[in-house]
């Protein structure tokens, strides 16, 4: 009896856990993305991404370590983590970095961080072609971070 109860409770817990991560599409089919392993949005009013038809939109990603939800140390490491965060979200919806059609990069110091952004992006993408990219210097980013990158991917649901 105890074993049956444990199995039943375990299955119920698994179903609840699955439901917590399932995202219902909007009336027009937009599905929000909050994949396992991504940074936590907590109880805030945003998702890390959304799929709308064949396009995947990833929210501005910072160099936050998903395991701790804290900014990683070091400029290059933080920029790399921002790219890795957007990569994870895109991959959760079936895209690769090569499917990126738009990058918008915000940095707190253009002269200091633009070369690092280019270096890390080249390492992660490998070789051209690279997606269109616009980089802005901004006065301040959330948590006084140095970089935030938002992105759009094209990944047809039917190939």
Where on the chain are the PLM-derived regions?
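N-terminal presequence-like segments and the immediate start of the first folded domain
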Residues: 2-84, 88-93, 98-101, 107-159
């Amino acid at each position: 009896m105890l074993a049956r109860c444990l199995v039943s409770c375990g299955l119920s817990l698994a179903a609840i856990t699955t439901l917590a991560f399932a995202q219902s599409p909007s009336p027009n089919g937009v599905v929000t993305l909050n994949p396992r392993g991504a940074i936590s949005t907590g109880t805030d009013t945003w998702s890390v991404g959304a799929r709308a038809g064949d396009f995947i939109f990833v929210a501005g990603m910072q160099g936050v370590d998903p395991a701790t939800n804290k900014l990683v140390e070091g400029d290059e490491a933080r920029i790399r983590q921002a790219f890795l965060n957007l990569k994870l979200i895109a991959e959760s919806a079936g895209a690769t970095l090569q499917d990126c059609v738009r990058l918008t990069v915000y940095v707190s110091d253009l002269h200091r961080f633009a070369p690092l952004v280019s270096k890390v992006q080249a390492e992660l993408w490998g070789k051209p072609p690279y997606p269109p990219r616009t980089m802005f210097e901004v006065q301040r980013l959330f948590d006084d971070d140095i970089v935030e990158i938002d992105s759009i991917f094209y990944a047809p649901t039917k190939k």
